[in-house]
Every structure is written in C-alpha cells, then in structure tokens.
From Swiss-Prot:
GO terms for biological process: protein quality control for misfolded or incompletely synthesized proteins; rescue of stalled ribosome. The record marks N10 as: Discriminates between blocked and unblocked aminoacyl-tRNA. It catalyses: an N-acyl-L-alpha-aminoacyl-tRNA + H2O = an N-acyl-L-amino acid + a tRNA + H(+). It is found in: Cytoplasm. SUPFAM superfamilies: Peptidyl-tRNA hydrolase-like. This is Peptidyl-tRNA hydrolase. It holds the Pfam family Pept_tRNA_hydro. Its main location: cytoplasm. It comes from Amoebophilus asiaticus (strain 5a2). The record marks D91 as: Stabilizes the basic form of H active site to accept a proton. Belongs to the PTH family.
Length: 191
C-alpha cells in the first residue's frame, strides 16, 4: 500500500526553521530516521521509504505555500494514491505550541496552504496533522509571526512534538486514521 505525506512549507534558506515550515521540519526528521534523502523532482522535493510493508512517499512542495495543492495533486495522480492515503502536515495558530491534532478532514481555517489543497483537490476531505505553533503575536501581525523563526527556547522544545509527529505518520500508515486519532488526540504516546 502507498501513502503520500505532504509537508507544507516554503522553499529557501530564509524560510528554514520558521513556524510556517514545521511541515518541512517534520518530514526532514522522518527522512533522517529512515536514512533517505530528498531529491528535486516535479513541483517538489521527494523521497520514499518502506515501513512495515507500506511505501511512504514524502513531498515538500517547491511551489511555495500558496500553491501547495498543485504539487499535491500532481503527486497524488502520478503515484495513484487515494486521497484518504495522504496526510498533510501543517502549522496551526489555533493550537498551543507543540500540540498535535490529527483530523480526517476540515476547513482551511484561513491557512493558504490548505486553501490551495482544497482548490486543487476539490475537497476538504483529506487527512491532516495540525502542528501547534502558538499565537504569540499582536493584532495584525499574523503573517509576520508565521514567517518568523522559532525562538531559541522554542527550538529546544520542538524535538519531542516533531518526534511524536513522525510516530503519528507511521501509525497512520499502519493502523489507519481512526485508531491513530484515538491515540494521538487523547495525548496517549504512540509506540
């Protein structure tokens, strides 16, 4: 069985370690755990590995956030992966820093990357793992906040939720979304 894991973010050195790029950071960690490297291909950086009989394809769109759906649609079609076998990793202002929430579907909640996915996939019914980045910004500064780098003290706290996100991705591919949601949304450690 094949799975497509889509990490949302922006390409370029200036966006590394920014809140908006947490999807890229999670995929970088997962690739490192499985000793695979990303290669540039059509509309994305891509890599893959096998896990418990499943093929996991990881993409980091090179289209920038606002056109992420274009890359997702291309790879879903090319690899012939059903939408329910995709998982999008996305930053979320509505969740506290480091909090993870797995959902089978939902609205974009104003997130441009998710809006793009909805536009290209023609549905809101695709699984997503929301990664809380907090909301410590003044009114009107949301854009600056999501494009800002994590503070040093936050960086030291990211390791645990990033590792947990990697476990959730693997659980999603082996146990399915319902059982994985029961575990991760209840804050039970995924083993």
């Amino acid at each position: 069985m094949k799975y497509l894991i889509i990490g949302l973010g922006n390409i370029g050195h200036e966006y590394e370690l920014t809140r908006h790029n947490i999807g890229f950071q999670v995929l970088d960690q997962l690739a490192a755990e499985h000793q695979v490297k990303f290669q540039i291909d059509r509309l994305a950086l891509i890599t893959s590995f096998s896990y418990k009989g499943r093929s996991l394809y990881l993409i980091k769109p090179t289209t920038y956030m606002n056109l992420s759906g274009k890359a997702a649609q291309y790879w879903i079609n090319k690899l012939k992966i059903p939408i329910e076998n995709t998982l999008t990793i996305v930053d979320d202002l509505a969740l506290p820093f480091g909090k993870l929430r797995l959902r089978p579907q939902g609205s974009s909640a104003g997130h441009n990357g998710l809006k793009s996915l909805e536009e290209y996939l023609k549905t809101q019914a695709y699984p997503r793992l929301r990664f809380g980045i907090g909301n410590d910004f003044t009114k009107g500064q949301q854009s600056n906040y999501v494009l800002s780098r994590f503070k040093d003290q936050e960086l030291s706290l990211l390791e645990s939720p990033i590792n947990q996100a990697c476990k959730i991705i693997k659980s999603f591919s082996t146990l399915g979304i319902t059982r994985t949601m029961e575990q991760c949304n209840a804050d039970v450690s995924i083993t």
